[in-house]
């Protein structure tokens, strides 16, 4: 409940007079703040007939990905340090992945403040094709006023498919590029984490592992995808525990790496070094981790399944980092790597939408003005 106070100084108060009643009616047409609706006539033949799925470019090794995987290995290996050393140097428990990345990427670079403002409303159901067509036309007109050659309009997954169909069949909307909204990209990560990984690891004993942390009745919700926050936390704890098991003996046995890791972790948490300066030690730990994973995978199918589980959740880490840090190439690559899992788990609408989205994003470098593309992807 809120309140409003209205007060007028005594010296500005006029002598009370009778207020005459207004006989005329105030006419309000309600056109201000609204966009005129442009009707859309759907063609008999769907525009999707002209869209063909093409092979996506696969670029699984580039500097930002290597850097991301290396700093992840540093975080994971920090839990192998002896408890006495952690208490002596840090005084508190080690941070989770999110907290560690926040400190590690504190110097990610300068940024400018953008203007955010409200746009007029379209008085139609958002799923109505005329509503989407009107929005695309309005966005196209606004971009022409700003002298932009390419116009990006964001939608969630269901509306994205409709907008793609409309823009593909309308030559006047050639400059408009419908893209999936950031929240939809996180929703894709939601589906990937909670459903794809949960279905693949069903019956592996992961449910029993989660039951040691969460109530037993909530574990099915985590595995089936109805509790995203809990699933992210549960998978993160499982990855952390498995990573410690894999790395602990290797790091503790090598006093040189143990000393380097302890010193590096202390400096990184204290803000004394940047991510770039951690690369020499991070490369060693990453190679140690990869070699051990390959060795374990060759032992038996059970070990191979759990190593594959670690690799699956590693994609979530890469995708989250790409979205938070604005890493264009890492964003595209992590989404491509998720595609086979969408198909395997029978989430075909997501697989179709993500493939079309990635196909459009890959074509931007050739279709867009170089200056606009650089500003869009940096």
Regions found by a protein language model. Give the residues of each.
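Buried hydrophobic core signal strongest for RNase H-like alpha/beta domains in large
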Residues: 1-378
């Amino acid at each position: 409940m809120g309140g409003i106070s209205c007060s007028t100084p005594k010296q500005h108060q006029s002598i009370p007079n009778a207020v005459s009643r207004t006989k005329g009616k105030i006419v309000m047409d309600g056109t201000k703040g609204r966009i005129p609706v442009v009707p859309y006539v759907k063609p008999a033949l769907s525009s999707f007939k002209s869209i063909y799925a093409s092979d996506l470019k696969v670029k699984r090794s580039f500097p930002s990905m290597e850097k991301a995987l290396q700093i992840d290995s540093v975080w994971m290996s920090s839990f192998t340090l002896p408890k006495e050393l952690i208490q002596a140097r840090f005084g508190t428990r080690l941070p989770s992945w999110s907290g560690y990345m926040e400190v590690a990427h504190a110097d990610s670079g300068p940024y400018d403040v953008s203007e955010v403002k409200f746009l007029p409303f379209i008085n139609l159901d958002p799923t109505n094709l005329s509503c989407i067509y009107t929005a695309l036309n309005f966005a196209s007109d606004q971009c022409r006023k700003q002298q932009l050659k390419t116009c990006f309009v964001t939608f969630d997954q269901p509306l994205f498919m409709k907008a793609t169909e409309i823009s593909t069949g309308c030559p006047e909307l050639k400059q408009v590029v419908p893209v999936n909204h950031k929240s939809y990209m996180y929703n894709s990560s939601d589906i990937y984490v909670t459903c794809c990984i949960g279905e693949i690891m069903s019956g592996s004993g992961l449910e029993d592992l989660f039951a040691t942390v969460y109530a037993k009745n909530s574990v099915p919700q985590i595995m089936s995808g109805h509790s995203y926050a809990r699933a992210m936390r549960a998978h993160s704890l499982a990855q952390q525990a498995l990573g410690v098991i894999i790395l602990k003996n290797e790091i503790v046995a090598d006093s040189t790496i143990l000393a380097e890791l302890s010193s590096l972790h202390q400096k990184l948490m204290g803000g004394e070094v940047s991510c770039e300066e951690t690369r020499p030690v991070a490369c060693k730990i990453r190679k140690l981790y990869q070699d051990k994973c390959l060795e374990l995978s060759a032992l038996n199918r059970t070990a191979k399944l759990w190593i594959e589980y670690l690799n699956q959740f590693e994609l979530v880490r890469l995708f989250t980092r790409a979205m938070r840090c604005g890493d264009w190439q890492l964003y595209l690559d992590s989404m491509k790597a998720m595609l086979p899992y969408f198909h395997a788990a029978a989430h075909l609408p997501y697989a179709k939408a993500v493939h079309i989205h990635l196909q459009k994003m890959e074509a931007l470098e050739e279709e867009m003005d170089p200056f606009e593309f650089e500003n869009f992807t940096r």
